[in-house]
Amino acid sequence: MTKYVFVTGGVVSSLGKGIAAASLAAILESRGLKVTLLKLDPYINVDPGTMSPLQHGEVFVTEDGAETDLDLGHYERFVSAKMRKSNNFTTGQIYESVISKERRGEYLGKTVQVIPHITNEIQAFVERGAKASHDGKADVAICEIGGTVGDIESLPFLEAARQMSLRLPLHSCAFVHLTLVPFISSAGELKTKPTQHSVQKLREIGIMPTVLLCRADRPIPNDERAKISLFSNVREEAVISVWDVDTIYKIPEMLQAQGMDDLICRELELNAKPADLSVWANLVYELANPKHEVTIGMVGKYVELTESYKSLIEALRHAGIHTHTRVNITYIDSEDIEKEGIDCLKDLDAILVPGGFGKRGTEGKIAAIRYARENQVPYLGICLGMQLAVIEFARHVANIVQANSTEFDADTESPVVALITEWLDREGRVEKRTNASDLGGTMRLGSQRCPVKPGTLAHRIYGAEVNERHRHRYEVNNTYVPKLEQSGLVISARTPNEMLPEMMELPDSMHPWFFGVQFHPEFTSTPRDGHPLFSAFIKAALIHQDATLKQVS
């Protein structure tokens, strides 16, 4: 039978519940337990797919094509289980399901209420999500509840968790509460009162924390931990200090050193072998002891909130681990390039243009791509970054001067990139869309396979086949591909059914390393295994750096 750990937050949001949940999962997995994770989001949106990256951060795409919270990216990077659509659900999905049942008459004329109908539906979603991994036989499902205790939006989720702990047999549920212990510089001390009030609020709901994770900018002294224990009614050994560190991959060792996994295993009556975190220790060592250093320029329009590119940033760091390289990322607003020119690109070892949507900032990205191509700087374009690389090549090499995307100009004379109107999804079903289709859930989503052209850079990186996750509406227009290929562009992979371009590159005779992919490889990178594309990109940056230094000397 699956046991459940509910992770809640207090005082303020963005304390790192997702990292805490993923770190606990990593420790339990190292003890031989089968672990899965769920994210319960209290917002009314059906999913984050239509939310602004500046509000929500990155949208993480699962293997089965769900647009989910970025915390699912943390989950996949910390444990071996693959997340699926059922590992993330929202208030919007819960209400949508309940209202649909009411319309079908499944409630037999009863008045539909938050308790029991909404809370029952939440519990059903939780139990369904727990069965999504490990063939439905997970030992532990760690459920992160978004928001903070006291938010009106979170109350049905907390009530559902309380009801589950009451309904299931004893020792089936544990509660981990993450809270803030701020340091007040004017007083020169840590303040525990916010944590006391947060736990009090949780207890009013009927939930007693098994473990308190106390976030601070420094380790919390034992006397302060004892004070928190006394006023929160949580045993002192279960008051765990979680302080700021330079990499999130230190968190599993930090929690395990304070016995958090033992506390959870004892509460849930789980018999498991001792934890082995040697993999995490090695990762931390590699991060702290690089042999090389490169600077990558990331040119985007959401750079003021780097959470918008969370998986991409982590993928570059993973590549650094596996190439013994410290990867410094310079974030460049593409609109600044439009206003101030390309001087900001001159000291970079490589340039990356990530995915994105909309016209704003695209000409700045195209200018950065042109700079990379003309100056032999390694370039990686992801999703929109590939589409813009094709547009730049079409304009300045293939002499298709008006080349553009119908996303930016619906009436363009040369739609080198255009809306996909029909394609097969990963299950082989025909999907169709038009300009009038809903934005939510109408993209090409999820993991899909395609063959790779022999003799290409793509083949050297990936081998004969690529299997990556997608999230896009627009695609390189096959009508223009012959002219682009005549000018030197190489389409190194296509979808097997629609023959849609999946990867493009320039031959060695034109550029040492210029590469674009329509999919999102960052979603499958992990710190343990890295990712071949990002490792190849960092190696190309090192080669370019070495060549540049030789020219200067």
From Swiss-Prot:
Q: Which residue ranges does the record assign to the Glutamine amidotransferase type-1 domain? A: 295-547
- CDD domains annotated for this entry? CTPS_N, GATase1_CTP_Synthase
**Annotated keywords:** ATP-binding, Glutamine amidotransferase, Ligase, Magnesium, Metal-binding, Nucleotide-binding, Pyrimidine biosynthesis
**Binding positions for UTP per the UniProt entry:** S13, K191, T192, K193, P194, T195, Q196, K227
Q: Where does CTP bind?
A: S13, D151, I152, E153, K191, T192, K193, P194, T195, Q196, K227
Which terms under GO biological process does the entry name? 'de novo' CTP biosynthetic process; pyrimidine nucleobase biosynthetic process
Entry keyword Nucleotide-binding: yes
Q: What does this protein's UniProt record list under function? A: Catalyzes the ATP-dependent amination of UTP to CTP with either L-glutamine or ammonia as the source of nitrogen. Regulates intracellular CTP levels through interactions with the four ribonucleotide triphosphates.
User: What does the record's miscellaneous section state?
Assistant: CTPSs have evolved a hybrid strategy for distinguishing between UTP and CTP. The overlapping regions of the product feedback inhibitory and substrate sites recognize a common feature in both compounds, the triphosphate moiety. To differentiate isosteric substrate and product pyrimidine rings, an additional pocket far from the expected kinase/ligase catalytic site, specifically recognizes the cytosine and ribose portions of the product inhibitor.
Q: Which protein, by its recorded name, is this?
A: CTP synthase
The scientific name of the source species is: Polynucleobacter asymbioticus (strain DSM 18221 / CIP 109841 / QLW-P1DMWA-1)
Gene that encodes the chain: pyrG
